[in-house]
Swiss-Prot record:
Region (Disordered): 93-130, 243-271
Species in which this protein is naturally found: Aspergillus fumigatus (strain ATCC MYA-4609 / CBS 101355 / FGSC A1100 / Af293) (Neosartorya fumigata)
Annotated Acidic residues bias: 262-271
Entry GO CC: GINS complex
Compartmental location: Nucleus
CDD domains membership: GINS_A_psf2 (cd11712), GINS_B_Psf2 (cd21694)
GO biological process: chromosome segregation; DNA replication; double-strand break repair via break-induced replication
Chief site of localization: nucleus
Assembly, per entry: Component of the GINS complex which is a heterotetramer of sld5, psf1, psf2 and psf3.
Gene responsible for this protein: psf2
Name recorded for this polypeptide: DNA replication complex GINS protein psf2
Pfam families, per database record: PSF2_N, Sld5
Biological role stated in the UniProt entry: The GINS complex plays an essential role in the initiation of DNA replication. Has a role in chromosome segregation.
Record-linked Gene3D superfamilies: 1.20.58.1020, 3.40.5.50
Lineage: Eukaryota, Fungi, Dikarya, Ascomycota, Pezizomycotina
Amino acid sequence: MAFPLPRGITPPEIAFLAEMEMVTILPRQRLEGLELLGGQVEPLLPPRRASLPLWLALLLKRQRRANILPPAWLHPEPLSLILEIETQHHEYENAFSPPPPLPGQPSVRDRNRGQRPIARARHTPDGQRYFPSPPFLPQNIAQDNAHPSEPPSLPYHWLEVGNMLLDAASDDLVDPDQIRRLLKELREVRMAKIRSGVDVLDAAATGGGGVALTGVGAMEIGESRGFVTGVVDGLRKIGASKEQARREQMAEEMANGGYDATQDDEDEMEF
């Protein structure tokens, strides 16, 4: 007997998509440029840094041909600050820490300078314009010149990228044990917020509200999809039965009211 297909994308499929994230490596050997489906890979010339897809960087790491430089957010200090925002700031008590700005969205530095960012469109080989989105945004590359006013933020594939780098390149990370602990605590805190958001699903199921998912990661959405959709379906059925009972009650009241008014008119005519 075959099991029914799960709703939406599964966690292994999400992890597969996360392997397209661009990361920074420090090559140990020379490697000629490659033509991949996702685009051209520049030649690797030690000790010059290069940006590669995560799957290729992990392959070179396993072959001991490169070291992976951790992204700016995958350090103990930024993760501790994000965990503090998630747990101690009242404005994020029922919300998630802000994600990195997308192309065309102002950052903190842009707001301070009063500048308006410009979203730069890219073009396909046949000339069509498009705007990239994760995993095709540079949200996981190493940054040495990060602006101090920019608060740390978790990218869309933070959980997948962090676990992959901990498994395959823990020797390239700063204090991997603490990073693993912080990632676990962040996941528990954020999943608790998702589960606590069930209270507002009653209004969302009947079209009277919605659930804010700003800052939620891809794996978090994939893992909670079955739970949330099951709750919404159950609430929708309960709401439908309540609506049907309300309509029947209104119809009964209208019928009784119409009957009483007719009787009163007949009594007045007889009098």
